[in-house]
From Swiss-Prot:
Any one GO molecular-function label of the UniProt entry: imidazoleglycerol-phosphate dehydratase activity
The name this protein goes by in its record: Imidazoleglycerol-phosphate dehydratase
Keyword Zinc appears in the UniProt entry: no
Catalytic reaction equation(s): D-erythro-1-(imidazol-4-yl)glycerol 3-phosphate = 3-(imidazol-4-yl)-2-oxopropyl phosphate + H2O
Name of the gene this protein is made from: hisB
Originating organism: Wolinella succinogenes (strain ATCC 29543 / DSM 1740 / CCUG 13145 / JCM 31913 / LMG 7466 / NCTC 11488 / FDC 602W)
Length: 190
């Protein structure tokens, strides 16, 4: 179990992650839809995840969402590297009603984000554009090369939820343990 506390002038976050857990989550960010997304992420990645975030929601949700991405990314970095005995690459396409989102990722320690989704508006108090901010903060702090691509869909709730679930399944697959692999790179270190 990895734990972190991160305090700034905008947020105070305490979080813990068990990468090889059972999908149990306790999430309290004050942003209902975002809590639901983080719970879905933990459930489908099979992580045990706790996040408690007190943020400046009177401004908006941006700082809380981005900083939760930073914290979760840091927890993942601590849990993943140096990468040994894992598949390293993961991908998944997740369907939610009319929507389908694909996630491809590389546990490479080379951060990158491709976010190719067209979503506007808000789901509750969660501005749709915050999804990209979360994924960017997560990828860059975890050291993931992360591609999230909308294949089809219109409903912003369905699109965002499919993206979080696709990330979850792709991460679960990339972190599948395989002792025959050793270091999953010809470089000898990730």
């Amino acid at each position: 179990m990895r734990e972190i506390t991160r305090t700034t002038k905008e947020t105070n976050i305490k979080a813990s992650l068990e990468l090889y857990g059972s999908g149990v989550a306790k999430i309290e960010t004050g942003i209902g839809f975002f809590d639901h997304m983080l719970e879905s992420l933990a459930k489908h990645a099979l992580w045990d995840l706790e996040i408690s975030c007190e943020g400046d929601l009177q401004v908006d949700a941006h700082h809380s969402v981005e900083d939760c991405g930073i914290v979760l990314g840091l927890l993942l970095r601590e849990s993943l590297y140096p990468a040994q005995g894992i598949e390293r690459f993961g991908n998944a396409s997740v369907v939610m009603d009319e929507s389908c989102v694909e996630c491809d990722l590389d546990v490479s320690n080379r951060p990158f984000l491709v976010f190719d989704m067209t979503i506007e508006g808000a789901v509750g108090e969660f501005d749709a554009e915050l999804a990209e901010e979360f994924f960017r903060a997560l990828a860059f702090n975890a050291g993931l090369s992360l591609h999230i691509v909308q294949k089809r869909g219109k409903n912003r709730h369905h699109l965002i939820e499919a993206a979080f679930k696709a990330l979850a399944v792709a991460m679960r697959r990339a972190c599948t343990q395989n002792p025959r692999i050793g270091t999953p790179s010809t470089k000898g270190l990730l």
